[in-house]
C-alpha cells in the first residue's frame, strides 16, 4: 500500500467559500437489502461512498456491485463489536465467542478494550485481518470508519494511527456533529442527542492532532450522528442550507426494508434539486 500522505486535511487546503459533501452509507455488505439500497442510492441519488463490512454474509455481493460502479468510493467499516470476526475464535478468544461473534454490548466492550491490556495484540491482529480482507477485494480504500464508531475508541485509534502506513490509512471519519444545528433541524430524543454530542466532541478533540500529524485526512464535521437512524428527507432538506464552508460528511444507513426512509431521502428529487440550487459539490473521501 502507498505511504500515508503528509499533507494536512483538505479543510485547510481548500478555499473556505466552497461547500463539498460526502454522502456515505454504513453497513455495506451486511445484507442484500442494504446492498441494493446503496447501489440504487448511488446510481439514482446523491450517495457517493459506502463503508464495507468485510466479515458479513453479503460482502461478496457488495464487492461485485462496487466493481460494477467504480465511481462509488468504498471504505472499510471496521467491526469490533456487534458482528463477526475475520480471524478464527481460537486466535482472538478475548474478543469473540466460540462462534466468532463479538459482543453486542457497546459499553462493556469499550471498557474491556480500554482496561484489558492483554486484548491489545488480539485487537491489532483482528484489525490487520480485516484490512487484509478489504485489500483482497482489489477495491481502492476510499476511507476508514468503525461500526458504532469504535474506530475512535482510544485503544483502537492508537493501533490505527501506529499502523497507518502499513494499513494504507489515508482518510478516516471524524465523528463530530453539531448539537446546535441538530436542535434546529430535528426535535426530540434530547438525552440521546446531548449525550452522544458530548462523547463525539470529546473523541474528535483528542484525535485531531494525531490525524494531522500522520497526514490522515477527514471531513470537518459528520452530520446525522445525532439523528439515531432518522436521516430522512425532512432532515436533509433542512441540513443542506446549513452546511458550513469546506468539507462535510452526511452519514446514513439506507436499506430497502428497515431504513427505507433513509434510502428514500437519498434518492429524493427535492434533495437533488436543492443540492444543485445551493451549488453543493458531492465528493468522495478520496477527493479530499
Model-derived features: positions:
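Terminal accessory/targeting
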Residues: 2-22, 32-143, 154-288
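DG-centered beta-turn motif at the end of beta-strands
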Residues: 25-28
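Active-site histidine-anchored catalytic micro-motif
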Residues: 145-148
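Alpha-helical and His/Cys-centered functional microenvironments
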Residues: 151
Amino acid at each position: 500500500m502507498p505511504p500515508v500522505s503528509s499533507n494536512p486535511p483538505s479543510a485547510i487546503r481548500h478555499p473556505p467559500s466552497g461547500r463539498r459533501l460526502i454522502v456515505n452509507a454504513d453497513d455495506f455488505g451486511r445484507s442484500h437489502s442494504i446492498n441494493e439500497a446503496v447501489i440504487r442510492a448511488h446510481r439514482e441519488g446523491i450517495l457517493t461512498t459506502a463503508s464495507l463490512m468485510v466479515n458479513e454474509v453479503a460482502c461478496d455481493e457488495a464487492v461485485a456491485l462496487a466493481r460494477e460502479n467504480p465511481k462509488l468510493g468504498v471504505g472499510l467499516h471496521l467491526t469490533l463489536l456487534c458482528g463477526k470476526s475475520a480471524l478464527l475464535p481460537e486466535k482472538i478468544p478475548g474478543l469473540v465467542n466460540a462462534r466468532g461473534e463479538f459482543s453486542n454490548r457497546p459499553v462493556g466492550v469499550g471498557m474491556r478494550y480500554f482496561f484489558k491490556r492483554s486484548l491489545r495484540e488480539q485487537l491489532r491482529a483482528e484489525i490487520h485481518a480485516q484490512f487484509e480482507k478489504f485489500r483482497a477485494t482489489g477495491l481502492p480504500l476510499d476511507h476508514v470508519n468503525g461500526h458504532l464508531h469504535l474506530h475512535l475508541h482510544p485503544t483502537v485509534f492508537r493501533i490505527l494511527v501506529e499502523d497507518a502506513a502499513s494499513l494504507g490509512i489515508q482518510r478516516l471519519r471524524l465523528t463530530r456533529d453539531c448539537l446546535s444545528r441538530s436542535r434546529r433541524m430535528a426535535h426530540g430524543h434530547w438525552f440521546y442527542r446531548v449525550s452522544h454530542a458530548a462523547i463525539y466532541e470529546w473523541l474528535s478533540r483528542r484525535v485531531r492532532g494525531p490525524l494531522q500529524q500522520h497526514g490522515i485526512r477527514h471531513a470537518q464535521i459528520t452530520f446525522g450522528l445525532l439523528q439515531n437512524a432518522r436521516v430522512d428527507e425532512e432532515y436533509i432538506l433542512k441540513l443542506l442550507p446549513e452546511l458550513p464552508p469546506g468539507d462535510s460528511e452526511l452519514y446514513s444507513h439506507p436499506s430497502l426494508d428497515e431504513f427505507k426512509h433513509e434510502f428514500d431521502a437519498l434518492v429524493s428529487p427535492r434533495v437533488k434539486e436543492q443540492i444543485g440550487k445551493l451549488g453543493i459539490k458531492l465528493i468522495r473521501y478520496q477527493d479530499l
